[in-house]
């Protein structure tokens, strides 16, 4: 979700010579599908459970990669890939957050932070690796390798997705803690009529939008800098973004239960604002990399603080649909 859209977009730009606007729709399609289907994923997970959500997500991932293999140089196919890729992310992320809060209801900050980190840190590692594969192997071989990697890793995830050992070992304590954290039990319809819900929504709309724009902006602005004689690699900017996105989730996992989400959210939002201000005055490759890193930090923070802002108020029972 965080690595492939900007890297694939750069490759499609080189082979299709499409405009920045047309290429920008690749990331937009991925984000739209992920955002719109997170709500659906939350509802479906209540009926099917976490394991079947992972099965659906795996199927969507593999189909998305098959689509671009069918016609690698087609921009419409790229849009279809992005929509399917974003959908697979939605069917993985929201169910995972809900599941770990149910399993470890008294360590919500830690476990949701670790789940967030597990989504973002591999992206930081994968960015230079996938970029190297695209450069040395070509697009088709890279996608085939990704198909194999997705199939193998997702089979392991599906197998491990229901921790029966945890249920048996801690059944009594889990039951009490779940009743405690589920006490509010607010429905989605009730949640959207509260000020707290719209405050969190505003954080996502403004802060999340500003941060995730960097997924497209990193490639287009680096191209602009190269055009005016400032040498900078789009891969370096993307790597900075996904690194900030991953590292801050690890930090947040360690400190959220002690510091709380409000302070962390304010600090990272202020840092992102200052970063974008800097970028408006400094035409530098290093400035782009720093701001890309800060955008990743802000996005990772929004992801990790949201459960701590929502669950204590609305409960865990309908967390998936409310978060979506």
Please state what every model-predicted region is:
Residues 1-20, 37-41, 126-127, 214-219:
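Extracytoplasmic
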Residues 204, 212-213, 233-309:
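C-terminal transmembrane helical hairpin of 12-TM major facilitator-type secondary transporters
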Residues 3, 31-39, 124, 242-250, ...:
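Residue-level signature of mid-helix packing/kink "hotspots" within the transmembrane helices
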Residues 59-73, 271-283:
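C-terminal ends and interior cores of transmembrane alpha-helices
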Residues 91-104, 111, 301-314:
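Intracellular juxtamembrane helix-capping segments at the cytosolic ends
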Residues 118-166:
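Helix-loop-helix hairpin linking two adjacent transmembrane segments in secondary transporters
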Residues 37-50, 248-260:
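Helix-to-loop junctions at the C-terminal end of transmembrane segments
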């Amino acid at each position: 979700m965080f690595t492939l859209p900007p890297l694939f977009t750069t490759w499609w730009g080189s082979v299709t010579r499409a405009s920045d606007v047309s290429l920008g729709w690749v990331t937009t399609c991925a984000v739209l599908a992920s955002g719109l289907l997170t709500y659906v994923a939350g509802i479906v997970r209540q009926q099917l459970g976490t394991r079947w959500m992972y099965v659906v997500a795996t199927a969507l991932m593999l189909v998305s990669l098959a689509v671009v293999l069918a016609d690698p140089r087609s921009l419409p196919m790229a849009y279809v890939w992005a929509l399917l890729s974003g959908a697979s992310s939605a069917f993985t992320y929201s169910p995972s957050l809900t599941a770990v809060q149910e399993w470890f209801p008294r360590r919500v900050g830690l476990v949701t932070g670790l789940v967030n980190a597990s989504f973002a840190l591999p992206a930081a590692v994968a960015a230079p690796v996938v970029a190297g594969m695209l450069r040395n192997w070509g697009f088709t071989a890279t996608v085939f390798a990704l198909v194999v990697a997705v199939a193998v890793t997702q089979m392991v995830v599906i197998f491990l997705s229901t921790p029966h050992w945890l249920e048996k070992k801690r059944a009594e304590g889990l039951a009490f803690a779940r009743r405690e954290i589920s006490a509010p039990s607010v429905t989605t319809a009730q949640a959207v009529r509260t000020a707290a819900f719209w405050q969190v929504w505003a954080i996502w709309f403004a802060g999340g939008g500003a941060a995730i724009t960097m997924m497209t902006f990193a490639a287009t602005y680096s191209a602009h800098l190269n055009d005016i004689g400032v040498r900078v690699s789009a891969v370096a900017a993307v790597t900075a973004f996904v690194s900030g996105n991953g590292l801050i989730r690890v930090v947040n996992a360690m400190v959220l239960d002690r510091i709380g989400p409000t302070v962390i959210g304010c600090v990272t939002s202020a840092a992102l604002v200052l970063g974008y201000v800097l970028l408006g005055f400094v035409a530098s490759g290093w400035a782009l990399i720093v701001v890309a890193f800060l955008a990743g930090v802000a996005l990772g923070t929004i992801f990790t603080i949201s459960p701590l802002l929502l669950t204590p108020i609305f409960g865990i029972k309908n967390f998936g649909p409310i978060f979506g």
